[in-house]
Amino acid sequence: MERMGLNEIREEYLKFFESKAHLRLPSFSLVPKNDKSLLLINAGMAPLKPYFTGLQVPPNKRVTTCQKCVRTGDIENVGKTSRHGTFFEMMGNFSFGDYFKKEIIPWAWEFITEILKLPKDKLYVTIYEDDDEALDIWVNKTDVDPKRIFRLGKEDNFWEHGLGPCGPCSEIHFDRGAGEVKTSEEFVKASDEDKIVEFWNLVFTQFDKDEEGNYNKLANPNIDTGMGLERMATIMQNVDTIFEVDTIKAVLDKVCELSGANYKEDRVKDISIRIITDHIRSITFMISDGILPSNEGRGYVLRRLLRRAARHGKTLGIKNTFLHNLTDIVIENCYKNYPELEEKREYIKKVIKLEEERFDETIDAGMQILNDYIKEVKNNNHKVLSGDKAFKLYDTYGFPVELTEEILEEEGISIDKEGFNKEMKEQRERARSAREETNYMGSEDTILNKIDLNINTDFEGYDKLEVKSKVAVIIKDEEFKNGMEKGNEGVIVTYNTPFYAEMGGQIGDTGIIYNDSFKAEVIDCKKNISGKVLHFVKILDGKVALEDQVILKVNEERRNNIRKNHTATHILHAALIKVVGDHVQQSGSYVDDERLRFDFSHFEAVSEDELKEVEKIVNKEIMKANAVNTKVMNIEEAKEQGAIALFDNKYKDDVRVVSVGNFSKELCGGTHVSNSGQIGMFKIVSEAGVAAGIRRIEAVTAFKAMEYVDHKNNILKEAAQILKCNEKELLNKLNHQVLEMKEKEKEIEALKLKLASGAEDEILNNIREIKGVKVASAAVKDIDGNALRDLGDKIRDNMQSGVVVLGSNYKGKVLFVAMATKDTVAKGVHCGKIIKEVATIAGGGGGGRPDMAQAGGKDPNKLEDAIKTVETVVESLVK
């Protein structure tokens, strides 16, 4: 057995199965497509599920891949052990109803003994206890020693996940110090002790488990194998852990260089070194696939990994941002197999650095708060931090709850997770997050995805708006039907169509389907998971049946408006790259007949001057009346010509390229104008941030742009009429009015302050004494926060010793302020606690220091009641 690098192992595996007539596919994105059950791709076969389930036709019956994967289920163990990691690559070869056991078993043995040259006396094989077929092949079609084959039960060697396809599996293992093993019991014991490690699982999907628990034979059994690349590398490089594998150790060595720490000298430091080494790999690949840090979904997973790694950097004494520098090491070791890493290197580093800087801004304040919480919990002899406090750290200071848990665990404290989840649920109800858009209709198990794969629905709508066809499928009430009649709503599928189905951000077409005996309105048009075009219809007249000849006609005016907006989006994209920078990448878009929306990567607001320049460039390209051309070409040729591809899309070998003159060139399957002049006019309506590092521009074109400009002009005219000036004088007139208003406001505030000062004597005359502490409290009217604090200062200074609590009803909101002298604080008075109790009654909250605090409230009607509680609260605090 010769030492082999990780990248070499990957290439040898893929080459081997290419030699067995397999199609080599590049790794799919970590972001699952059309699978809402997964947050991130976590297994080699996960992106191939539609092929196994028959929902899509595979590009070849034999496929081989090396799939990047992220798993965070046992993240708390990453770093603490040298075995666990979040990022890994899974090599696999797959058969979709083609070859089966008699092919894969000999191939597997050939690869590991002849290509990898693993010593046969170090290999063990396990099979399912009832799988005599697999045993026969292992014994008679390979030269494995039969004594090294063990039969194991369902728990170890049978793959199933609920109902549906399942089957036995055969695993191949390597002896890493067990010595000779003679029985299955000895084998299991050695495996549990990691003296024997499994490195390749061959799954024979040959059954379909039904609801009664029966295992029915599949007509076309499948093969699904998985070999962990990093684990295989530990064997080929004769190292004990993944952190000693060549490509991963390069990252670990850089962590040690940046921190000045030596690996394997300090157990605590080793944990931090391993966490950073592992997490930066996941972080780099996740960002390269278009994921950005956020507080939801996969973005939260990324933020959690990034901030956990950053925190452990500080534990190692690394003071400045550093993770973005580690990205270079990851990319240098991976870019040959993942060229997108090199293409997006600077973007990935910028996202990481920005998130590190944001975390740096909050971590010190957050750690101070957390340390205060820890002291409070320990002083009260408690072992649990309340959920609302953990949520505050998460919501205000950006601390992932798992990071808070990790820090608390070091102090022997846990979190009230139920309380935290309650706070999280309430926040989500207050601000419901946007649902992720999908490119197909419905979930995988809907009837829309059960349409016969042999039915083709050819799209002819690039150059036709009306075609003749036959009805291939009718669906109504979640059932396949032979026909529909007037008043029914459902789905019609035809063999060809001019209707564009919603895809790539472009909304679906509408129109009509008709013949002499029926007419249906097409309300929407989408695709199912296998790409069939679904016409969502309402039958307006007559009846329609399967195989009826029909005419399909797209709403031409609506389609033309969509075309204008889609082509304008391409020009906008190119203009943004020119003005804002070449780091701009599309992260989402929406195009309909009224407007366009474009989301793109950028790390700050686009300035007004930049927006004006972008708008000017887009309109200039429109006025040039550039020809818009489409051409189908090889993906590599398209890239060589500089065509822009979507961030995380996987493309076929041949792609459609849309060019607008020499200004814009993008891979796109949408519909476009034939000449940029047809767009007419372009106007930006808004620019805003929608997520960390993502900006959104909304714009209108053609007549909608004219309407927008007319509306703005009408507002200017009306404003000029109100101010009794012409439009040229409007700004000067407005500035003059604003200055006058500010002067009046100052006069009003001065009068209010004078009135408040008049209330000072009355408040001082009503001081009470509670347990030796003087208390002044009152509700005053129409005083803002500054005036309220000034009044509080005067009363406290007059009292010389005591506590003052004031409340004000100002512009429909309640304001509170509390102040205390040092001697009363020494007696137990705490303004932060007082103000919190008082403000709660008025529907608000707040806090502060022992000697000064302020708060707000929502219910002015409760102001008097809130002030009345001051004495009771003070009494409870004074020692």
From Swiss-Prot:
Its cofactor is Zn(2+). Zn(2+) binds at residues 566, 570, 668, 672. It comes from the Bacteria. CDD domains: AlaRS_core. Binds 1 zinc ion per subunit. The keyword Cytoplasm applies. PROSITE patterns: AA_TRNA_LIGASE_II_ALA. It is an enzyme of class 6 (ligase). Its main location: cytoplasm. Catalyzes the attachment of alanine to tRNA(Ala) in a two-step reaction: alanine is first activated by ATP to form Ala-AMP and then transferred to the acceptor end of tRNA(Ala). Also edits incorrectly charged Ser-tRNA(Ala) and Gly-tRNA(Ala) via its editing domain. Consists of three domains; the N-terminal catalytic domain, the editing domain and the C-terminal C-Ala domain. The editing domain removes incorrectly charged amino acids, while the C-Ala domain, along with tRNA(Ala), serves as a bridge to cooperatively bring together the editing and aminoacylation centers thus stimulating deacylation of misacylated tRNAs. This is Alanine--tRNA ligase. It comes from Clostridium botulinum (strain Okra / Type B1). The lineage of its organism: Bacteria, Bacillati, Bacillota, Clostridia, Eubacteriales.
